[in-house]
Amino acid sequence: MQRWTVSEINQEQTHMPSVFDTRADSILSQLRDSGQFKLLQMIEGPMDASVRIRGYGDCLCFCSNNYLGLANHAEVVEAGIRGLRDFGAGTASVRFICGTFTPHEVLEKTIARMMGTESSYTFVSAWTAAEALFPTLCEPGDTIISDELNHACLIDAIRLATTIKKGVHKAVYKNNVLEGEKSLRAALEAARANKEATGQIWVVTDGVFSMEGSIADLPAMRKMCDEYNALLVVDDSHGHGVMGKLGRGTHEHFGMVDALDTPARSGAANRIDLFTGTLGKALGGGAGGFIAASKRATDLIIQRGRPTLFSNALPCTVACSANKAIEIMLREPQRVQRLKDNVAYARQQIGAAGFDVLKSPTAICPIIVHDTAKAIAMSKRLLELGVFVIGFGYPVVPEGHARLRVQISAAHTNQHIDQLVDALKKL
């Protein structure tokens, strides 16, 4: 057997680039040449209305999911510090072995109370929550019907479910906001007519669509789901802290949940059947996601969900911070109202400046510029002017629909918004 020295191996490798290396270099070159290469901006302090960015100094932040301004709230930070001191840095296990701590129990009760559900269960991310939901709860013969504009975590979770469990069917309907009820009803009719689809029908939607800022027509969807004996699943990651008087979500906005602390009625006609959501946006905990649903659903997730069985629990420090953030949101409805006032002012001022901003009551204010390279160039120029806004283009949004996504926070003031508009006028 021939023996190779390290220098001979290194020399051999320098003349034999892998297929991956060649392919990756080609893709990255195309992204750079087209102006679509994304640069990571290094933030050198806490998240707030203004952030310190390496190379740019202090900039107004209009691209954060920190909708209620809780990411650096003193009580939220202190709760995390106490959690770190009391429970340590890591859980060192999955939940069913020795990774379930009292902060998990407290947080999950708080989430269920907020959402108006029987139960909830937490994960290290909302992506993981979605990944646990469909492959665990769906069985062959089921049909999953998904909005075309749903978040990538839902899309990939549905793909995973249909791959793992052969015989799970999927369908996509035109966006509920743009196309109304016709496309969804057609998908429901097709599912009912499919002789191989004899199981449960699941209708899946974002509550607030992350790129459009629009909201799903949940009352109409609930009515259709009842007609076809379908379950309604809502990912409300951009609705928590934003929609409804208390910030409980899009279902509260539509009056589809009882007052806080009213006992949950499993299967009631005005309910959303299952939620997925995040703790890393308005709810200020820094990371983590959850499923909120009936106890039978969360019990099945605990018993059979692969992300539950084979992935570590949410760190206790994050659970403590998130619990405090929800507590603050529910006790301070004026914080949610301030966000709504800021959103209304921002949309009015941006529109008055001549920009095409999509209309919505949510904190996401997309300014349509159509071309991806243009959106990225505008984002760069805004940063030079001291305003942090991100440009989004293909493949995050369809070709020709590139945009600047302005995101408003309760931490912003009218003066901050005026500075944003002044910078936009200079583009």
Give residue spans per PLM region.
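PLP-dependent aminotransferase class I/II
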Residues: 283-350, 355-358
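PLP-dependent enzyme catalytic core of the Aspartate aminotransferase-like
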Residues: 1-4, 8-13, 74, 78-82, ...
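N-terminal "arm"/small-domain region of PLP-dependent enzymes with the aminotransferase-like
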Residues: 22-89, 230
